[in-house]
From Swiss-Prot:
Recorded GO MF terms: lipid-linked peptidoglycan transporter activity; peptidoglycan glycosyltransferase activity
Major localisation: membrane
Domain of life per record: Bacteria
Keywords: Cell cycle, Cell division, Cell inner membrane, Cell membrane, Cell shape, Cell wall biogenesis/degradation, Glycosyltransferase, Membrane, Peptidoglycan synthesis, Transferase, Transmembrane, Transmembrane helix
Function comment: Peptidoglycan polymerase that is essential for cell division.
Entry similarity comment: Belongs to the SEDS family. FtsW subfamily.
Lipid bilayer topology: Multi-pass membrane protein
Membrane-spanning parts: 21-41, 58-78, 93-113, 122-142, 154-174, 178-198, 200-220, 290-310, 319-339, 356-376
Catalytic reaction equation(s): [GlcNAc-(1->4)-Mur2Ac(oyl-L-Ala-gamma-D-Glu-L-Lys-D-Ala-D-Ala)](n)-di-trans,octa-cis-undecaprenyl diphosphate + beta-D-GlcNAc-(1->4)-Mur2Ac(oyl-L-Ala-gamma-D-Glu-L-Lys-D-Ala-D-Ala)-di-trans,octa-cis-undecaprenyl diphosphate = [GlcNAc-(1->4)-Mur2Ac(oyl-L-Ala-gamma-D-Glu-L-Lys-D-Ala-D-Ala)](n+1)-di-trans,octa-cis-undecaprenyl diphosphate + di-trans,octa-cis-undecaprenyl diphosphate + H(+)
Organism placement in taxonomy: Bacteria, Pseudomonadati, Pseudomonadota, Gammaproteobacteria, Methylococcales
Protein name: Probable peptidoglycan glycosyltransferase FtsW
Record gene name: ftsW
E.C. number: 2.4.99.28
The species this protein was found in: Methylococcus capsulatus (strain ATCC 33009 / NCIMB 11132 / Bath)
Gene Ontology terms: cellular component: cell division site; plasma membrane
Pfam families: FTSW_RODA_SPOVE
Length: 398
């Protein structure tokens, strides 16, 4: 790619002393748009719930505003981290993530919600540790690929070794239990290894093994099997196992093309469980109709496109770690948003996955914003490399 082309596509240039930060304005605009859109919809979906739980209609909107501010701070902090520093500590971060997964399973430390022990309290904020592990897993796999690219491309061992370490995290996630996060982590890793050039037959074989393992896990856990059966025919038991899905489908049916109007949802009024978190997309479909739901899908498609484009730019600049980290973040966010929306629309069995940047929650918001911040850093370093500025042309990092 020519220097002239890079200069024309470098986006917003922020200056700080002698340093510069090359900001992706498209990614910034779309990310802020999703956060603002999510805040409006969380407010709409939770006013009645706040009144019931805390005698304050704006209880959840006020907390979500704090979550957004914390997320912006996390994104700012992540954008300040030098990529070589992150790569150097990628293995340590991975084992720190494993330690968090162990910590949450210790009685008295992990917090149980709806029968799952997935949260710990950090500085007054309830954090879902699986969200943190998704990011550190992507960082670890990117670091592994940058160190062992030839092995990944030529040897079965090159794929099995990182997946075997991730399997440790998968086992701990399943103990919570969190099957959805397990699927996202493993699928993201497989996607990154595939993009690294792993042999097709090895990739297909491992994909088949993962699929078989997933099937076994479904059939050996009654609650997972019940979710799959209710997905196949939610109307067979609409008041029990199929309740969430049937209520979500009713929400989309009521929304039709243009929706019933912002704030006018009926399903959010104690019919649709987790309307402000996992099933926020159903409220969007009901209140804003097909056009609102399609807008959200397009915004997430742009986020994934920018992540992959940033990864390609970093790969051309010669920074493999940055490239595959961007690819991993793109796969993760795209897959998680697809699963969440698919569950809401009845395309997939029910999973406990949030809609990135939109659903209510502080831990998820901070982690996803940190991932977006890393994308900004990756792009800035890649553009600086093409412009010949090197480290001297960047904002100072840690």
């Amino acid at each position: 790619m020519s220097t002239q082309a890079i200069r024309g596509a470098r986006g917003l240039v922020l200056k700080w002393g002698a340093g510069r930060f090359y900001l992706d304005t498209v990614l910034l605009s779309v990310s802020l748009g999703l956060m603002l859109f999510g805040f409006v919809m969380v407010s709409s979906a939770s006013l009645h719930l706040g009144e019931k739980m805390a005698s304050d209609s704006f209880y959840f909107p006020k907390h979500q505003l704090v979550h957004i501010l914390l997320g912006l701070a996390a994104g700012w902090g992540a954008a300040r981290v030098r990529l070589d520093t992150l790569e150097r500590h990628s293995r340590s971060l991975f084992w720190a993530g494993i330690a968090l997964l162990v910590l949450v399973l210790i009685p008295g430390v992990g917090k149980s919600v709806n029968g799952s022990v997935r949260w710990i309290n950090l500085f007054g904020l309830r954090v879902q540790v699986s969200e943190v592990f998704k990011l550190v897993a992507a960082i670890y796999v990117a670091g592994y690929i940058s160190r062992h690219l030839d092995t990944v491309r030529t040897s079965v061992k090159g794929m099995i070794f990182p997946l075997s370490l991730l399997a440790i995290g998968a086992v701990l996630l399943l103990k919570e239990p969190d099957f959805g996060a397990t699927a996202v982590v493993m699928a993201t890793a497989l996607g990154m290894l595939f993009l690294a050039g792993a042999r097709l037959w090895v990739f297909v074989g491992l994909l088949g093994l993962v699929a078989v393992a997933g099937t076994v896990l479904i059939y050996t856990a009654e609650y997972r099997l019940r979710r799959v059966l209710s997905f196949l025919d939610p109307w067979a038991d609409p008041l029990n196992s199929g309740f969430q899905l049937t209520q979500a489908l009713i929400a989309f049916g009521r929304g039709e093309w243009q929706g019933v109007g912002l704030g006018s949802s009926v399903q959010k009024l104690f019919y649709l469980p987790e309307a402000h978190t996992d099933f926020l997309f159903s409220v969007i479909g009901e209140e804003l109709g097909l056009w609102g739901a399609t807008t959200v899908i397009l915004l997430f498609a742009i986020v994934v496109w920018r992540a992959l484009a940033i990864g390609r730019l970093a790969e051309r600049s010669g920074n493999l770690f940055a490239a595959f980290l961007a690819y991993g973040i793109g796969i993760w966010l795209g897959l998680q948003s697809f699963i969440n929306m698919g569950v809401n629309m009845g395309m997939l069995p029910t999973k406990g996955l949030t809609l990135p940047l939109m659903s209510y929650g502080g831990g998820s918001m901070m982690v996803v914003c940190a991932a977006i911040g890393l994308l900004f850093r990756i792009r800035s370093e890649a553009v600086a490399s093409f412009l010949g500025n090197g480290r001297k042309g960047l904002w100072p990092g840690v």
